[in-house]
Amino acid sequence: MLYLTEQDVTELLTMPEALAAVEQAFRALAVGDATSESRRRVRARDSVLMTMSAAMDSLGVFGLKAYTVAAGKARFHVSLYDAATGELLALIEADKLGQMRTGAASGIATKFLARESAETVGIYGTGWQAQSQLEAVCAVRKISRVTVFSRSAENCERFCQQMSHSLSVALLPVAEPEAAADADILITITSSREPVLKGAWLRPGTHLNAAGGNSILRREFDDDVLKRASFLTADSLAQSQMEAGEFVTAVEKGLLKWERVQELRHVVNGAMRGRKSDDDITLFKSLGLAIEDVVT
């Protein structure tokens, strides 16, 4: 059995590899070559265990991602099994893996939904996950400028310095959230329970990756974003109905029907066209799929 540590994953996995793997995962889902089960939660006192599983026939593997949140700390592991024999092939420490595949999912959505000419980014959030979100978007579009909003000015400045150096792109911290919305591509990667992005701020042609919330209690954008969007997509409709706070809230208010929400796999595989004009506003709601972990 192979055991990979966080350091191993950091040294071995590149963003181009993560992007290729996640695109492969979405294509496999589209043609029935892969299955991916939604996240499940088990609670004990103040701790929680989350599990999600997936299989891919052509790779001959299935896998399980399990992670705990206890005593203020999260721990992630992915187990890979031989689908023919059931043998445990690998156990992988998966915090970095999860960060990379989450960023890559937004990168693939951007590749297929953002305007080809998109060159500016606005990002809300400056934490661990924000790094790979921006790296992935910069890998699929030629980005010239990034505006960054965070509720912490110190974190915002630190993020701008770090990422401008690693990506060789100009990053500009902004004090007001509306200022970050003046961009071709928007990324929300926060844990906010109240919207940080308003639909009134969106300009025609914007693509939004909303990747911060996988809890029904979280809402990164308001109802007006959904009203203005021409095309809504998610990594999983079933998972969205359990975890996408923005969608669930809008459905409960009668502002959204689930039929409007399409799965990204159909766009990636060419069965569905997402963007139909340069003025369309497109949205990808990312919740995270086990198949992304298994294939990556």
Please report, for each region that a protein language model flagged, where it lies by residue.
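Glycine-rich Rossmann-fold phosphate-binding loop(s) that bind the pyrophosphate
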Residues: 126-127
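N-terminal Rossmann-fold NAD(P) dinucleotide-binding loop
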Residues: 130-131
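Glycine-rich phosphate/adenylate-binding loop
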Residues: 269-296
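Short helix-loop-beta connector
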Residues: 113-120, 142, 203-204
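Short acidic low-complexity segments
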Residues: 167-183, 197-200
